[in-house]
Amino acid sequence: MNPSIRLYAWQGTNADGLAVSGQMAGRSPAYVRAGLLRQGILVARLRPAGRAWRWPKRREKTDPAGFSRQLATLLKAGVPLLQAFEVMGRSGCDAAQAALLARLKQDVASGLGLADALQRHPGWFDTLYCNLVRVGEQSGTLDRQLEQLAGMLEQRLALHKKLRKAMIYPLLLLLTGLGVSAVLLLEVIPQFQSLFAGFDAALPAFTQWVIDLSTGLGRHAPVLLVSAVLLAVAARELYRKHRPARLWITQRVLGLPVFGKLLGQAALARFARSLATSYAAGVPLLDALGTVAKASGGELHQQAIQRLRQGMANGQGLNQAMAAEPLFPPLLVQLVAIGESSGTLDQMLEKAASHYEEQVSQALDQLTSLLEPAIVLVLGLLVGGLVVAMYLPIFQLGSLI
């Protein structure tokens, strides 16, 4: 194999005139264009793939979808695994990613399987990922398995990004409003207070209350700030290290009227898609449940999935075990029952995952459209109330003249 092989990203149109895009390995742009033309694809744009699998430093919160997609593309093109690592290392990755690829290449060259090599890097690849790669290695379908993994991870990442994006703007609005209110209370209102000190008349009750609040905050602001930081750190450590507290918090969050339902449906989508991918790859259902439980992302759901596994070990069908768990809604149970009876369990789970992802997407759009004006209204009332409180004595004084 020519060592000059590179990975190229392309955009073009297929025989039906539809816009398509993807990645392909080749020795040169002309080689890639010719290969795509043989597939009926007319290339409009072609460039070397770069930084396609960049991951942030907080690696544990991101899925290696880009890694899977690039590696699958190279393997499908006939590039040997060791050389594929070299090609990916030349595709614009940073120092940490280059070091990871070098270690993977070294481990595989020493005789380890890819799954075993990946398992040495749990901060990058979780148990579910490694197990599915192992299935692909054993069945001789590693490239196809990596493509399926990439699809699953891309869906999961897209849902996570949508959840995060929906919360960013309302959170920024809230923080901005609170910041403006803090400036008014700590900087502006004390100046009005010195102005009102020369008034002989008593201040309105609302104005006096705001001044007292400003005085109290100014006097105790450092203590309140330090206390808030310490409380946040303590709560975070309690959640991370104390299992009963983690379960209690998760139950309270899932019980919230709107956000709880959103997070619950997102967890169901993750469960259904992960289980569908594992089962479709040929992993036995009991083993697949054990792996999916570890990758479920939540203590409450992890316990529920382990109980499903226990129920199946005792002779129950998956749908029967799910029916006994309140975390799994009747629709999901019914789809699983249909899948088990018809031998299409992986397809029914994929349908369930798509359904819950669509539900989350629609609910997020509706929530965002309602939440943003509500926050603006509340913040307007808050800031406007502080301003009115300061001008009430002036209006009162003007009416007496």
Curated annotation (Swiss-Prot):
Keywords: Cell inner membrane, Cell membrane, Fimbrium biogenesis, Membrane, Protein transport, Transmembrane, Transmembrane helix, Transport. Pfam families: T2SSF. The keyword 4Fe-4S does not apply. It is a multi-pass membrane protein. One of its GO terms (biological process) is protein secretion by the type II secretion system. One of its GO terms (cellular component) is plasma membrane. It is found in: Cell inner membrane. The chain crosses the membrane at residues 166-186, 215-235, 375-395. Involved in the translocation of the type IV pilin (PilA). Belongs to the GSP F family. This is Type 4 fimbrial assembly protein PilC.
